Structure formats: structure tokens, C-alpha cells
């Protein structure tokens, strides 16, 4: 970081007037006149100490512990906001906007810059919030909606699987193709109705998914249709059957 010019030249600038003072007398707080050169040296020393202090003791958010605490706080705010929304089924447009804003704050502190190169993505994740109407099926009676939805990704085998639970236990498996270190193209292959009746997916069953945040506990993703998906880790050891 470059030092201010006043520290290099010994000339001081009055913060009140913007004028430089050099080679004259300046009034000190004590009421005694102090030679400018001496006062400049003293102020310069104080400024150098201030700069050194900043870099020796950076603000908390710049330290490793500070970043971790900030991530924890932002995640907690997000989780508390989505908790009463039934995975998004009861979210109003204002709720969706607020969740999106909180999600973007979490995404901004993503500790995993290249998710598809990390093992953190692998495993079975439980969907806890989404804006996808096709998943939420909010217009159906509640007893006809899936109680829990899971998504599994295995980066090493390039497989993805979405699963519903009671009452229908439908699932679908597909292939993923990395487009970069965060985004994949998805091609669904086989649906299983009631968990065991296979139906080949149509060729149009394609999309893209970008992983915008992932750690050991939480994953945020955004689809190519603008939907937000928030998931919590359920089973990091789960493998998609080949």
C-alpha cells in the first residue's frame, strides 16, 4: 500500500482546508508553536503506526475466524427465514425476494470457489427451499405432495439423481457434464414412477445447474430457468446406483 505523499515529503495537509504547510510554524494543541518539520515527523510516525496496526491486526471479517463467523451468521439468517415457508410452498413474492437477497449474501462468502473440483458436492442432499413450481406442486392438496425431496450428485461418475418420498416415491436419474468449475449441463435419463416403474426421459429433459455455494452443511444452486435451490447435507456417503 502506497504511503500518503505527506509521509514521503514531510509536508502536511490540513484536513480542514486542504492546504499544505511546510517550513513555517504551526500551532499545536498545547498552545506552543512547534516547527513544522518536527510536527510533520511526529504526525508521520503516528500515521505509519496506524497503517502498521491495520495490517498487523486486520478487521475481524478479514481474518479466517472472522470469515467463518460471518458465514455462520449469514447461513443462520437464511435458514431462519426459510424455516416457516414449507420449502417455499407458502412463500409470497415478498418472501421469495427476501430469501433471494439473503441467499446472495451467503453466496458472496462461498468458501468453495470451484465446487465441481471438491468432494463437498458429493452425497445426498435434502431440499429445504426452492422457487421451482414443478417441484413444490403447491396447487396440489398437501397430502399429494412429496413430504421430502432429495438430490444426489456424484461428480466422479457424472451422475445426478432427484428423489421424492411419500406418497409416490418418484425419482429420476441423469448425467451431468461440467461446463466450468461451477456449472453443469444436466440430461435426465430415466424416471422411476412409484420407485420401480422405469420410463425413459424425453430428449427435452435437459437443463443447467450452477452451484453457487457449498460447504459441509449447506448447498445453494441456481438453475437455468432462474430457480433457486437450497439444500442441507443428509448423507455425504451416499452413492447413486450405476
Swiss-Prot record:
Disulfide bonds: none
Coiled coil, from the record: 63-87
Alphabetized InterPro entries for the sequence: PAP (IPR039633), PAP/fibrillin_dom (IPR006843)
GO CC terms in record: chloroplast; chloroplast thylakoid; chloroplast thylakoid membrane; cytosol; plastoglobule
UniProtKB keywords: Chloroplast, Coiled coil, Plastid, Thylakoid, Transit peptide
Cited Pfam families: PAP_fibrillin
Record keyword rRNA-binding present: no
PANTHER family hit by this protein: PLASTID-LIPID-ASSOCIATED PROTEIN 4, CHLOROPLASTIC-RELATED
Protein name, as recorded: Probable plastid-lipid-associated protein 4, chloroplastic
Source organism per UniProt: Arabidopsis thaliana
Source species taxonomy: Eukaryota, Viridiplantae, Streptophyta, Embryophyta, Tracheophyta
Amino acid at each position: 500500500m502506497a504511503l500518503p505523499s505527506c509521509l514521503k515529503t514531510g509536508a502536511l495537509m490540513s484536513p480542514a482546508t486542504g492546504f499544505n504547510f511546510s517550513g513555517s510554524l504551526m500551532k499545536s494543541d498545547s498552545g506552543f508553536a512547534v516547527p513544522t518539520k518536527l510536527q510533520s515527523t511526529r504526525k508521520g510516525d503516528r500515521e505509519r503506526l496506524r497503517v502498521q496496526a491495520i495490517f498487523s491486526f486486520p478487521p475481524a471479517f478479514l481474518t479466517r475466524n472472522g470469515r467463518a463467523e460471518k458465514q455462520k451468521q449469514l447461513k443462520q439468517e437464511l435458514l431462519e427465514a426459510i424455516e416457516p415457508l414449507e420449502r417455499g410452498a407458502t412463500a409470497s413474492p415478498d418472501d421469495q425476494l427476501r430469501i433471494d437477497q439473503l441467499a446472495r449474501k451467503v453466496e458472496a462468502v462461498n468458501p468453495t470457489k470451484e465446487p465441481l473440483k471438491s468432494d463437498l458436492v458429493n452425497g445426498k442432499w435434502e431440499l429445504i427451499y426452492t422457487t421451482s413450481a414443478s417441484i413444490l406442486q403447491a396447487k396440489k392438496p398437501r397430502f399429494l405432495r412429496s413430504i421430502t425431496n432429495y438430490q444426489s450428485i456424484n461428480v466422479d461418475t457424472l451422475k445426478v439423481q432427484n428423489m421424492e418420498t411419500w406418497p409416490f416415491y418418484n425419482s429420476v436419474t441423469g448425467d451431468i457434464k461440467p461446463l466450468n468449475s461451477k456449472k453443469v449441463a444436466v440430461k435426465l435419463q430415466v424416471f422411476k414412477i412409484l420407485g420401480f416403474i422405469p420410463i425413459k426421459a424425453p430428449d427435452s429433459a435437459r437443463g443447467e445447474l450452477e452451484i453457487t455455494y457449498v460447504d459441509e452443511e449447506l448447498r445453494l444452486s441456481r438453475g437455468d430457468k432462474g430457480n433457486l435451490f437450497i439444500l442441507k447435507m443428509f448423507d455425504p456417503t451416499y452413492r447413486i446406483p450405476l
